[in-house]
């Protein structure tokens, strides 16, 4: 588990670690252990049996950073680079509170992607999935870009993160369901590709 906590001027990519506690407890309740990775600048997690706040242990090292990503059952990541470690070693990942949206295309079909919500500040309405995957909004990466377009960023809440965690756990426990999910993921990508081809008038 890696939860990005950067400087205050980088709030676009940050997440509140406390909104992950319900998911952590879900994993532990199913017999798993959760290793929270990162560095000592991060917020300390509450003491929970089965949760290892790894950055604050004597075992913290670059080797262990890679080892944990390589040997985990799956990884939970945010808008930071660590999630690429488990992916490199063929492990599935759940990305939550993620921006930019179009990074979804860098994932394989067995992974789950839950981007941050984007709302129109003028109307108060959520921006549709179709618009999220357009080539302008989908590549926004800084607060100014969102502000200039009257877009508010809303983090996933703890229940959304928990529901996604339950989903990936169930997928890992049920091979048939995982095959169905992979097919749905491919179909979704095809639909978005067709939509963007209409906009740009060339194959994506």
Annotated model-derived regions:
Residues 1-7, 17-61, 180-191:
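Catalytic donor nucleotide-activated moiety binding site of glycosyltransferases and closely related
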Residues 8-12:
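Surface-exposed cleft-lining segments at the edges of enzyme active sites
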Residues 13-16, 61, 154, 158:
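Aromatic-acidic/polar surface patches that form glycan- and anion
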Residues 15-22, 69, 162-163:
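Well-ordered, non-membrane alpha-helical segments in soluble/globular domains
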Residues 33, 81, 174-178:
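Intrinsically disordered or highly flexible coil/loop and linker segments, enriched in small
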Residues 65-111:
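A donor-sugar binding/catalytic signature common to diverse glycosyltransferases
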Residues 109-204:
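Leloir-type glycosyltransferase catalytic cores
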């Amino acid at each position: 588990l890696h939860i990005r906590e950067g400087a205050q001027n980088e709030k676009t990519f940050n997440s509140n670690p406390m909104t992950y506690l319900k998911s952590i407890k879900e994993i532990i309740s199913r017999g798993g252990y959760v290793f929270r990775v990162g560095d000592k600048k991060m917020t300390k997690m509450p003491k929970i049996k089965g949760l290892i706040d790894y950055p604050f242990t004597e075992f913290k090292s670059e080797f262990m950073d890679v080892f944990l990503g390589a040997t985990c059952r799956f990884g939970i990541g945010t808008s930071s680079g660590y999630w690429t470690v488990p992916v490199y070693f063929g492990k599935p990942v759940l990305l939550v509170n993620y921006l930019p949206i179009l990074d979804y295309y860098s994932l394989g079909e067995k992974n789950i992607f839950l981007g941050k919500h984007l709302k129109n500040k003028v109307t108060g309405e959520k921006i549709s999935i179709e618009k999220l995957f357009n080539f302008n909004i989908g590549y926004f990466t800084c607060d100014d870009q969102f502000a200039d377009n009257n877009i508010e960023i809303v983090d996933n809440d703890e229940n959304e993160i928990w529901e996604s965690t339950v989903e990936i756990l169930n997928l890992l426990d049920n091979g048939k369901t995982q095959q169905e999910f992979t097919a749905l993921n491919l179909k979704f990508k095809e639909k978005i590709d067709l939509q963007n081809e209409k906009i740009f008038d060339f194959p994506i």
